[in-house]
Amino acid sequence: MEDSDSAAKQLGLAEAAAVAAAAAVAAAAAAAAESEAEEPVLSRDEDSEEDADSEAERETRRVTAVAVMAAESGHMDMGTEALPSPDEAAAAAAAFAEVTTVTVANVGSSADNVFTTSVANAASISGHVLSGRTALQIGDSLNTEKATLIVVHTDGSIVETTGLKGPAAPLTPGPQSPPTPLAPGQEKGGTKYNWDPSVYDSELPVRCRNISGTLYKSRLGSGGRGRCIKQGENWYSPTEFEAMAGRASSKDWKRSIRYAGRPLQCLIQDGILNPHAASCTCAACCDDMTLSGPVRLFVPYKRRKKENELPTTPVKKDSPKNITLLPATAATTFTVTPSGQITTSGALTFDRASTVEATAVISESPAQGDVFAGATVQEAGVQPPCRVGHPEPHYPGYQDSCQIAPFPEAALPTSHPKIVLTSLPALAVPPSTPTKAVSPTVVSGLEMSEHRSWLYLEEMVNSLLNTAQQLKTLFEQAKQASSCREAAVTQARMQVDTERKEQSCVNCGREAMSECTGCHKVNYCSTFCQRKDWKDHQHVCGQSASVTVQADDVHVEESVIEKVAV
């Protein structure tokens, strides 16, 4: 699409140059013909030449003269071109007589970029009449991105127009009028809408559906009160006026009643109308101009934000950082999330025996970063940030070579000349450009720091394993203690249930409060149950004397004792 637009623009410029050249040729031919016509004596040869020149002049007059005024001086330069010969002028005029091309390109939005096209002796165009020399102005209504190509035949018919968007209003011959300036009230108040100056009058013609009236600003109240609209000989409030027009169900007189095609809400937004509050007690709201009360204006309700409402600004999230190792053959990427988790996407090796040249580029973000290049690194590793600035313990038992379980030795490459540490999205500095040399003391310090870092990592892993083992042991102990507790509780419940069963009354089954003093094996809840059960229990108890229950003496008559005695 861009290629076609640029081609159209180039074609338009070429055609505009051709049109200008043809116009210049026509003017030169006309001037030559007039100078030759002034000579009184002509020979036969000169007569033939004059006929040819007059014919060329007639052909030239049929050519449409085009004058193009461009906003930029670099588009066209016609002042330094030399005039062609009469023969070339006649040939160009004859070739140009059929079709005239008018090209307008690079139309800007300013008022100075106006292209004026003059059409001479053209017939009527469809919808327009061009008589004599008519100026056609194409102004700001054209699109600023596309070129305009207009092909006009000499018979006056428009053949083709491409890349031209029709203006909102029809184009009329003659100079364009400048845009009308804003009214003084609009410039000062800064209204949102373009109003007629009559909007500031005290009386405004309003309409609701097909009923018209006159709104008096001085009598405007809250809408429900204050009869400010006069229709005929009657006065109505805005709500009554919209109800009379059949819009009572809308309950929004600010949008039902219109002035100049716009609802009254637009006038209220621009501050031209100021309705009163519902609690206003002024003379207009009370429909009594003899009263005088305070005026309370209507204040639009603004929605308040809740306290627990989330803020509109997005919360900045910490993006995961990538540590990419770029060796000669493969690449390994470590992703460090904001929570501290580390994930890898390949194999990693640390060649502790060989000394290689590496370039380390450490970048915190694409916008800012520190570059360390040209360092001699013997061991490649990642230093944990938590150990910076703290003394490291010395472990004499560790050897120079160590193995890490998560990375098998067989799957790891061993010779990688370059190691690059970077973060998302990409490096800003190429890793192959050395910028600063590091002294051997710094390199040895880095080696010691790396060795201590690996020792610290191994110690931390061992401590984590020990902690996990201890946690597992404590878990088993807690589980056993819980099971023992449940067994003890179950046994205590069974014992309590057994005791309750033993202490129940043998007669009624209720909870026993006393027992037999003779055998201490039978329990009773009351003396009534004891007397009732005595007939059966006396054979088991084996006592014929009186029975005492809880220090209560039971006296039995002698006759009964004699009968019961065995």
Curated annotation (Swiss-Prot):
Region feature (Disordered): 33-62, 163-191
Zinc finger (MYND-type) boundaries: 505-541
Disruption of the gene: reported phenotype: Exencephaly and skeletal abnormalities in the rib cage and cervical vertebrae but no presphenoid bone or cranial nerve defects. DEAF1 homozygous mice neonates die 100% of the time and DEAF1 heterozygous mice survived in a 2:1 ratio.
Annotated stretches, region: Interaction with LMO4: 404-479
Biased composition (Pro residues): 170-182
Binding site for Zn(2+) 2: 516, 519, 537, 541
Gene Ontology, cellular component aspect: cytoplasm; fibrillar center; nucleoplasm; nucleus; RNA polymerase II transcription regulator complex
Domain SAND residue range list: 194-274
Cross-referenced InterPro entries: SAND-like_dom_sf, SAND_dom, TF_DEAF-1, Znf_MYND
Protein's GO biological process: behavioral fear response; embryonic skeletal system development; neural tube closure; positive regulation of DNA-templated transcription; regulation of mammary gland epithelial cell proliferation; regulation of transcription by RNA polymerase II; visual learning
Protein biosynthesis is among the record's keywords: no
Phosphoserine modified-residue sites: 177, 444, 449
Record key words, sorted: Cytoplasm, Developmental protein, DNA-binding, Metal-binding, Neurogenesis, Nucleus, Phosphoprotein, Transcription, Transcription regulation, Zinc, Zinc-finger
Binding of Zn(2+) 1, residues: 505, 508, 525, 529
Matching Gene3D superfamilies: 6.10.140.2220, SAND domain-like
Molecular function GO terms recorded: DNA-binding transcription repressor activity, RNA polymerase II-specific; RNA polymerase II transcription regulatory region sequence-specific DNA binding; zinc ion binding
A Pfam match: zf-MYND
Span of the annotated motif Nuclear localization signal: 300-306
Tissue: Ubiquitously expressed during embryogenesis, with higher expression in regions of the central nervous system, dorsal root ganglia, submandibular gland, epidermis and breast. In 12-week-old NOD mice, expression of isoform 2 is sevenfold higher in lymph node stromal elements than in T-cells and tenfold higher than in B-cells.
PANTHER family: DEFORMED EPIDERMAL AUTOREGULATORY FACTOR 1 HOMOLOG, DEFORMED EPIDERMAL AUTOREGULATORY FACTOR 1 HOMOLOG SUPPRESSIN
Protein task: Transcription factor that binds to sequence with multiple copies of 5'-TTC[CG]G-3' present in its own promoter and that of the HNRPA2B1 gene. Down-regulates transcription of these genes. Binds to the retinoic acid response element (RARE) 5'-AGGGTTCACCGAAAGTTCA-3'. Activates the proenkephalin gene independently of promoter binding, probably through protein-protein interaction. Regulates epithelial cell proliferation and side-branching in the mammary gland. Required for neural tube closure and skeletal patterning. Controls the expression of peripheral tissue antigens in pancreatic lymph nodes.
Subunit structure: Homodimer. Isoform 1 and isoform 2 may form a heterodimer. May interact with the corepressors NCOR1 and NCRO2. Identified in a complex with XRCC5 and XRCC6. Interacts (via the SAND domain) with the DNA-PK complex subunit XRCC6; the interaction is direct with XRCC6 and may be inhibited by DNA-binding. Interacts with LMO4; LMO4 blocks export from nucleus. Interacts with LMO2 and CLIM2.
UniProt name for this protein: Deformed epidermal autoregulatory factor 1 homolog
Organism annotation: Mus musculus (Mouse)
Gene name, Swiss-Prot/TrEMBL: Deaf1
